[in-house]
Amino acid sequence: MSSRLRIPLWLLLPTTALVYFVTTVSTQITCRDCTNRGCFCVGEKGSMGIPGPQGPPGAQGIRGFPGPEGLPGPKGQKGSQGPPGPQGIKGDRGIIGVPGFPGNDGANGRPGEPGPPGAPGWDGCNGTDGAPGVPGLPGPPGMPGFPGPPGVPGMKGEPAIGYAGAPGEKGDAGMPGMPGLPGPPGRDGFPGEKGDRGDVGQAGPRGPPGEAGPPGNPGIGSIGPKGDPGEQGPRGPQGPPGPVPSTGAKGTIIGPEGAPGMKGEKGDPGEAGPRGFPGTPGVAGQPGLPGMKGEKGLSGPAGPRGKEGRPGLPGPPGFKGDRGLDGLPGVPGLPGQKGEAGFPGRDGAKGARGPPGPPGGGEFSDGPPGPPGLPGREGQPGPPGADGYPGPPGPQGPQGLPGGPGLPGLPGLEGLPGPKGEKGDSGIPGAPGVQGPPGLAGPPGAKGEPGPRGVDGQSIPGLPGKDGRPGLDGLPGRKGEMGLPGVRGPPGDSLNGLPGPPGPRGPQGPKGYDGRDGAPGLPGIPGPKGDRGGTCAFCAHGAKGEKGDAGYAGLPGPQGERGLPGIPGATGAPGDDGLPGAPGRPGPPGPPGQDGLPGLPGQKGEPTQLTLRPGPPGYPGQKGETGFPGPRGQEGLPGKPGIVGAPGLPGPPGPKGEPGLTGLPEKPGKDGIPGLPGLKGEPGYGQPGMPGLPGMKGDAGLPGLPGLPGAVGPMGPPVPESQLRPGPPGKDGLPGLPGPKGEAGFPGAPGLQGPAGLPGLPGMKGNPGLPGAPGLAGLPGIPGEKGIAGKPGLPGLTGAKGEAGYPGQPGLPGPKGEPGPSTTGPPGPPGFPGLKGKDGIPGAPGLPGLEGQRGLPGVPGQKGEIGLPGLAGAPGFPGAKGEPGLPGLPGKEGPQGPPGQPGAPGFPGQKGDEGLPGLPGVSGMKGDTGLPGVPGLAGPPGQPGFPGQKGQPGFPGVAGAKGEAGLPGLPGAPGQKGEQGLAGLPGIPGMKGAPGIPGAPGQDGLPGLPGVKGDRGFNGLPGEKGEPGPAARDGEKGEPGLPGQPGLRGPQGPPGLPGLPGLKGDEGQPGYGAPGLMGEKGLPGLPGKPGRPGAPGPKGLDGAPGFPGLKGEAGLPGAPGLPGQDGLPGLPGQKGESGFPGQPGLVGPPGLPGKMGAPGIRGEKGDAGLPGLPGERGLDGLPGQKGEAGFPGAPGLPGPVGPKGSAGAPGFPGLKGEPGLPGLEGQPGPRGMKGEAGLPGAPGRDGLPGLPGMKGEAGLPGLPGQPGKSITGPKGNAGLPGLPGKDGLPGLPGLKGEPGKPGYAGAAGIKGEPGLPGIPGAKGEPGLSGIPGKRGNDGIPGKPGPAGLPGLPGMKGESGLPGPQGPAGLPGLPGLKGEPGLPGFPGQKGETGFPGQPGIPGLPGMKGDSGYPGAPGRDGAPGKQGEPGPMGPPGAQPIVQRGEKGEMGPMGAPGIRGEKGLPGLDGLPGPSGPPGFAGAKGRDGFPGQPGMPGEKGAPGLPGFPGIEGIPGPPGLPGPSGPPGPPGPSYKDGFLLVKHSQTSEVPQCPPGMVKLWDGYSLLYIEGNEKSHNQDLGHAGSCLSRFSTMPFLFCDVNNVCNYASRNDKSYWLSTTAPIPMMPVSEGGIEPYISRCAVCEAPANVIAVHSQTIQIPNCPNGWNSLWIGYSFAMHTGAGAEGGGQSLSSPGSCLEDFRATPFIECNGARGTCHYFANKFSFWLTTIEDDQQFRIPESETLKAGSLRTRVSRCQVCIRSPDVQPYRG
């Protein structure tokens, strides 16, 4: 209960006392007697007496009814602890408990008593031999022995004396004697016969190259047809294996859970809960970084006009300004006052005879002439008059300025070849390349525009919605009204400034002086025919009247079209001699000067009036630089093909040539080679120039930053309530800024997995993204064409006659003067900054810069996310003593503790019940001597007896009375664990203990929830230097890093190369000078230009062929020729490296359609193209075979349902069509059965990234519609969409339209090709964290199923919750050129640049001061029609109420035929027409050069069968052929495993098929037990490697992986043994590779047990030889062995450590010392049944005792023995 209901006890006590007090005061009645002893009288009633004393308490009343329940009283205090309850009844026997933990080892027991003697032992071993005894007596002599062996031959005896005997027989041949000395050389023998031809000797060394032979005769021939394709080669080896999967993370895998149940139905919505309490305000965030500079705001309203300032001091006179641009022509004024009489004009031509005049004064006499008539109306401007006669020659004018370069002359004669020049500069970048093929389809497009407005809903007001998130800033408002004119700026810089824009039209000047009479006007247009005069048959003609006044000058006519160039005029008469010049002496010719900077192009010179004759041919000029491509010439005759020369060395750069003529637009060329990066230029000086003329409309830029909201406008007038209706729902606001980071929510419960939805429709177009990074500056646009001139304005009012004007404008420029001297002037002042140049071609990457200085500390970052829990830290120092904590809740039952210290003696307990008699105890040790007892009574002394033997222990006596408590006993053995007692009272908090020893680190817990982002810590101390790590191997190429921070600004580079010539400057004003003196007659002039080429002469006779000339210089690139015919298709080249993506070229104009090329070889099936425009209908073709499936067309409008047709006759079966294109993506089918495991595919190569697509061509202009009626009719039906029209002039921004209705959902589009990576999108809203799913088992990748039928378009889905933020994508390729953005803000003024290096010679100097005013020039030609004026203000907005949609009106009358439209764009090429008639036979061409030898031709068609021949005579029998190859056999499924013992995959023996390859597994060890693999069986070749290729599972449906100390052992390679265990990618070089092959017969291993290689049995062939590997052991004496008949027992390579141990959980491998390999040894024949002699072999001699072996396969041609 709340504390408000508790009433304190001390408040109740006084109220009780008060009640008690009131009840005790009762009435007291006093009796007043009124009797008299005398008389009795009745007195009046007295007043009430005072109350009497309180009466005694009354008797106890009846028990009242129970009252209502009172308020609950206060909580009582805790009662004192009650006495312990009585002992409960003994409970039932419990079930057998879980076996307890083993107890601690007990203390050592006392030593036992000595045991009895043991049984007699076994007989001992024989003793050692005794010492030799004393020698005995000699025995008797023995028996005689056997005869001994014959003795050695004795010495030679003395010769006997006797007679000579008869000759003996011939003895045996003696031993061959020693070789004799060599004899002298003999004479030469006769020459022998010619011997047989000897064997071919070895090739000698390569001889020197021979001299070049004479050129051969030209061969005649043509390229032969392509040869047949060769036979299919043998199957290549299997490709490399796929990537090795990484070992999975440690963890415990829980068995599969059941399938989720069906999703329940959606429940009713619950009631709205109460509003929660307001949260506490969050912590104030750190101040944000300064934002970007905002857009310039809208102009504010004009302020009140300020006070007029005081007039300033007069400024100094400014510099003379440059000539401004020509102003716009003014409106023609009213005619001025009549001028003075002009010079008399030439007599006009005699006019036509007029009609007879009216009769004179009388009937027969002429009347007097009438007064002159009024001047006629202003005539229309007449046509231009004929050229006047040439005037007399004027005086020679002053020498003009040197003219600009003339038009390029005709090419001179070809000069002698110059010396080989140096390498030229890089050429001008070529025109953009040919438009590439359409790229891959891009990613899905952006969210589309909102659809049309839906049907108005019913206006039932809904509940008020929640406040939306604040929207983003709106787009910048419309342009405001023009502000007041700004303060006048400072005067411009006349020396260094650029010419400004044309100034505004000045006020009307004062009236000028009367001018001289003007030249006679142009003749007027003949007037209309006059009324017929009165007829007078007899009247004479009237006299000729006086000449009338000149009429008003006509209005200027519109500007005519530019005429064709006129014919050159006749030669004028020579002028008068000029004034004599100062006599000069011709100086010697100076040395040729360096090439000057290219001059600005001058004005076109006047046509010369001299008749030119071709001069003598000049010396050959130097070759100029390559000009721009000239106009496309006519197609020339084909020339003779020249001999292909060797490419020459690059020549030196020639001087700059004249600018070439602009070429015709052709197809854009390929991208040029990127140039070298230019050097950084110096910053220039100068003020910024005035804005240039407006260029053509650029493409829309990237969207600018959102502008600030405009100022709030004034409040509008209130709308009457009658017109208030709920408006249509507005568009969704822009998404608000992301709110502050919320508190971390609790993780939600995992939801059930819903069924897979149908594929959604394409989403709506997304909101515009944040502005991207600024793109590269585009190329400057081409200046726009001049707009159409407006109509002339109305004539102005007549001005008052003005005062004398200032001197007039200088006259027109004079004729082109003689060339001036060419001395180089002094360098001019620094030029103005040029326009921004085009972006250079990206340079080669620079060298890495020097290491920069350490940067300043950065701005503190935002608070980071909570990290994962760290590793256990080192134990900390003991903390200070803590405050005692509150008593905790009782803990769970703990395990039994060790025995405690002996307790203090307890109080004596009550006497217990008598126990059952115990078993007899073990006799105790002798006790210590007791205390002396009380002296007994003295007995009689007895005789001392002998000590008796120890008696048997007696039966236990009756239990005596309970004695006094003895001393505490020794500690007993630990008892069994008692049952859990009641929870005791919480103890008093103890003292804080000393800090314990730090415990062992616990196992890793689950990762915690993400914590609150912590503050940034301080930088740690630098660590100690680590041990050197193992030698690194080259890692794989990493992902591209994020772009680095921009580096510091580098030092200033040297000045750049001179720029390209600038644009043509404005025309300068002509200078004025004093007339020079007459010069002497000059030297003869330069030879004139060559004349025009004459008409072509008749064809001459063929001359004799000349000698081949020297190789000429490479000519200028010719204009692109007409497209040639398609050549034969080349052989496919090798796949090139991916090039860098080129810059997208400009879209070129469409080229002329090329000729139809020869049909190419049928290419591979291409990707599906976009559907083309329908062409015109061609002629009906012959019926073709069934074509390939076409692309799906756009869905048509549904047609009306037709009547059901009758069944047709069954058709013939058609030919089998080509497989169709893959259909649209179908609905997901039911889950299929698990497929068989497929073979792992070879990894594919990376595809080339697609090029960005080009901007598409403009479409065809739409057809003009019929003119509509101007009355606002009812709304008609929507027409069919027209073809897109040409771009119109940009209109004024229209009024904001009403939102459209939502459109129908479109059909699902065709699945696009994967697009290029887009620009990273804006950061999405943080999504709700999903519950981490359980890790599924890896399935075997199935084969891709067939695409299903396309699904129906699904309903439009609800917007999903924002997903979690994805990782930052790689930077995408540059996107397509964006639309031009809103104009950016002007940047801040940059720092002043460093002074630059001295510049190259500047342009010609500034214009000098003005000369004296010249004589007024002649009237100029009428100006061109002025530009149209600015758009007037918009008219008043008509108030138009939206009418109802009317019925469709009747068909209108056909309109008037419109004017002929502009010619349309070239159409798409139509279908090929029928072949034309064969043309006439052309002339014979020149014989061509011999072609390259053609490839082997295809075999010809078989010839016609010849005439049957006469049968020939029978031939001789041929020799018997070799035995044929064995017939086809079927593989019997024998498997052979080959281990390479290297990191290379072995090849199968010839004739065998490789089934798979992998890694050589020897055995595995789990739970301290090993399992061996026979290396000859396929199970020893695992296709994937892992240090832990298995996991183990127990009976609890739990499997554990990489959680124990299990191991795997693999055959290893010859890689050197590492010092430390290797891990991850470092393991691969140590694991042997293997291949499993299918053999045609059985395979065995034979062992020789010697160092000789054994032979295979008869009928068996050898596969490989090796060493006999028998057994192996590893950790814990576990291991295995090989069957000696298996090929796995014969390893090709011997090494003492043929395998490596890998620890599964750690993921490392190493050669440990307890690994042993066992090999068969060599056994000699005589050592078979002997005791082996121990022997130790050192490195280098190990193979001397290892048995050799051979693996054999049964020959397929051996017939099995059939008994």
Swiss-Prot record:
Main localisation: secreted
Signal peptide: 1-26
Residue stretches of biased makeup (Gly residues): 400-409
InterPro entries documented for this protein: Collagen, Collagen_IV_NC, Collagen_IV_NC_sf, Collagen_Structural_Proteins, CTDL_fold
Chain spans, region Triple-helical region: 43-1529
Record domain Collagen IV NC1: where: 1533-1756
Modifications after synthesis and translation: Prolines at the third position of the tripeptide repeating unit (G-X-Y) are hydroxylated in some or all of the chains. Type IV collagens contain numerous cysteine residues which are involved in inter- and intramolecular disulfide bonding. 12 of these, located in the NC1 domain, are conserved in all known type IV collagens.
Region spans: 7S domain: 27-42
Annotated glycosylation sites: 126
Compositionally biased intervals (Pro residues): 135-152, 206-217, 583-592, 810-832, 1511-1528
Annotated region described as Disordered, given as residue ranges: 51-529, 550-1529
The entry's keywords: Basement membrane, Collagen, Disulfide bond, Extracellular matrix, Glycoprotein, Hydroxylation, Proteoglycan, Repeat, Secreted, Signal
Bias-annotated ranges (Basic and acidic residues): 190-199, 466-481
Subcellular localization, as worded in the UniProt entry: Secreted, Extracellular space, Extracellular matrix, Basement membrane
Composition skew (Low complexity), residue ranges: 72-81, 225-235, 326-335, 410-419, 428-453, 564-582, 699-714, 731-783, 865-895, 946-977, 1040-1051, 1077-1086, 1108-1146, 1210-1231, 1280-1296, 1367-1386, 1462-1480, 1499-1510
Cellular component terms per the entry's GO annotation: basement membrane; collagen trimer; extracellular region
GO molecular function ontology, one term from the record: extracellular matrix structural constituent
Record keyword Secreted present: yes
Disulfide bonding pattern of the chain: 1548-1637, 1581-1634, 1593-1599, 1656-1752, 1690-1749, 1702-1709
UniProt remark on domains: Alpha chains of type IV collagen have a non-collagenous domain (NC1) at their C-terminus, frequent interruptions of the G-X-Y repeats in the long central triple-helical domain (which may cause flexibility in the triple helix), and a short N-terminal triple-helical 7S domain.
Family: Belongs to the type IV collagen family.
Functional note: Collagen type IV is specific for basement membranes.
Known partners and oligomeric status: Trimers of two alpha 1(IV) and one alpha 2(IV) chain. Type IV collagen forms a mesh-like network linked through intermolecular interactions between 7S domains and between NC1 domains.
Protein name, UniProt field: Collagen alpha-2(IV) chain
Source organism (scientific name): Ascaris suum (Pig roundworm)
